[in-house]
């Protein structure tokens, strides 16, 4: 099956990036948010990112206009998905929220429509069970910033069909992404490796081993990381990091995945990183 029209559920950081790459590659996109102000904000972010691409001569002005004209915004999930070939959900890492959304999507989307989640850690099989089409359900984990990062983790659930997998793999390549197949385990590959490293870096601060800037300097200068783990945590969002650590901890029942108490306190205090202007570092 060829994917000609997509619905993206959620216009936040990941959702607007996913919308951007589909629209820029000639695929019509229905983007839904909870209200029109948030939908307009997502569209504005996409336009700003396209403007940067025009300035850097990666695309021309006509391509920018064509991309924006390929996007239609909605505030009703049911209206968004009624005529699409693929739905990509990109809401926060909360199982109950995703389950509720996919129950609505499953009822409203055409029978042929593939349902994909951008979850970075939650079981694909578990979310798929909330629908009547687990064979058409799959994980499609993009990376931030979506227009730049080339990787997509493709995650089959217990009942995902080979046809569904092949369609999503082909679609990922059409988006100029590299699809990597991974099994349905908590955190998949990316976050199972990355998040414990970030969590351990937070423990270094929590236990007084080193200051945040020094922890990051060690990893950048000594391990050739382009960005330190604490700066990266701020960029991702400390709330997101905590959600993923909780999924790992609950999924594996292994104390090595226990979230650092400092991470929990910072999230409770609303210091979430870039998005709030303060995390391990301060931002304008």
Where do the protein language model's features map onto the residues?
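Amphipathic alpha-helical segments at domain termini/boundaries
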Residues: 23-26, 66-86, 167, 172-176, ...
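Rossmann-like dinucleotide-binding cores of NAD(P)H-dependent redox enzymes
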Residues: 31-48, 52-65, 154-165, 179, ...
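NAD(P)-dependent Rossmann-like dehydrogenase/reductase catalytic/cofactor-binding core
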Residues: 2, 27, 162-166, 173-184, ...
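Rossmann-fold dinucleotide-binding core
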Residues: 114-184, 188-192
């Amino acid at each position: 099956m060829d994917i000609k029209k997509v619905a993206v559920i959620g216009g936040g950081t990941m959702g607007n990036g996913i919308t951007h790459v589909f629209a820029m590659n000639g695929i019509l996109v229905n983007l839904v948010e909870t209200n029109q102000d948030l939908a307009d904000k997502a569209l504005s972010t996409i336009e700003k990112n396209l403007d940067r691409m025009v300035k850097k001569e990666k695309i021309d002005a006509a391509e920018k206009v064509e991309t924006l004209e390929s996007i239609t915004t909605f505030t009703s999930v049911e209206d968004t998905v009624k005529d699409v070939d693929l739905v990509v959900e990109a809401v926060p890492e909360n199982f109950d929220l995703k389950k509720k959304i996919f129950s609505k999507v499953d009822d409203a989307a055409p029978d042929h429509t593939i349902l994909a989640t951008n979850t970075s850690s939650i079981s694909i099989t578990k979310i798929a069970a909330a629908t009547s089409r687990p064979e058409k359900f799959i994980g499609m984990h993009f990376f931030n910033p979506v227009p730049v990062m080339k990787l997509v983790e493709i995650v089959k659930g217990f009942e995902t069909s080979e046809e569904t997998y092949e369609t999503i793999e082909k679609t990922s390549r059409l988006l100029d992404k590299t699809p990597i197949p991974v099994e349905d385990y908590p955190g998949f590959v990316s976050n199972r490796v990355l998040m414990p490293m970030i969590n351990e870096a937070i423990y270094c601060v929590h236990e007084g081993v080193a200051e945040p800037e020094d922890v990051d300097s060690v990893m950048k200068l000594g391990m050739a990381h382009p960005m330190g783990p604490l700066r990266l945590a701020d960029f991702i969002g400390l709330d997101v990091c905590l959600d993923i650590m909780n999924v790992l901890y609950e999924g594996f029942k292994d104390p090595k995945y226990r979230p650092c108490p400092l991470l929990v306190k910072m999230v409770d205090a609303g210091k979430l990183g870039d998005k709030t202007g303060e995390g391990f570092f301060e931002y304008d």
